[in-house]
Amino acid sequence: IDFYIETPGGSGTAAEEIARFLRKKFESVNFVIAGEAKSAGTILALSGDNIYMTETGSLGPIDAQVKIGRSIVSAHDYKAWIDEKRIEASTTGRLNPLDAIVISQISPGEIYGVVNSLEYAKDLVKKWLCEYKFKTWNITKTRKVRVTPEMKQERASYVADLLCNHMEWRTHGRSLKIDDLQELIVIEKIDDDKKLADIVYRIKTVLKLIMSGSTTYKI
């Protein structure tokens, strides 16, 4: 199946359920992206055998966003801050009074929840890349070396860690275009095939018209 996806993001668990459903029904799953497929949309796209993108298409960082108090924050940033303060406390024996007040209001459950949210996205991406996207990756592009299962796992971990690294992208809403991603994973460029590009752009236009000019809702 060729699955056209366009979403600003959503639930990682929903992405997992959709991926499982598609894999039960279809032997090969390809994702087509002409708009944005951010956050959970990126996680889902990485479960595909192939990713096809236009120049207008974009993926995004997959660092989990968690609710802490009244704010939604990056799980990666939150964990990094906690780790930084832990090291500071063990090194100097004390904390800045303001930091101490903030930390005193954080429960162990919140910390574990943040860590689990972050690792959940990584686990999905690492598993799916090895099983599907890297399934036919047998020879390296530059050195022409045979690809081992360990090499696939190492590469999958690198991709997952990088996409989860909020410090790398600075904002969860960052748009990652084909040129940003080609060194990371292989993405097929739709615009290189004029006939295919015309079909995909028509689909994109029709869907936008349906969503904006009718009573149809995206759930």
Regions found by a protein language model. Give the residues of each.
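A generic, well-ordered mixed alpha/beta core segment in the N-terminal half of proteins
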Residues: 24, 29-64
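N-terminal organellar transit peptides
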Residues: 1-30, 52-54, 65-219
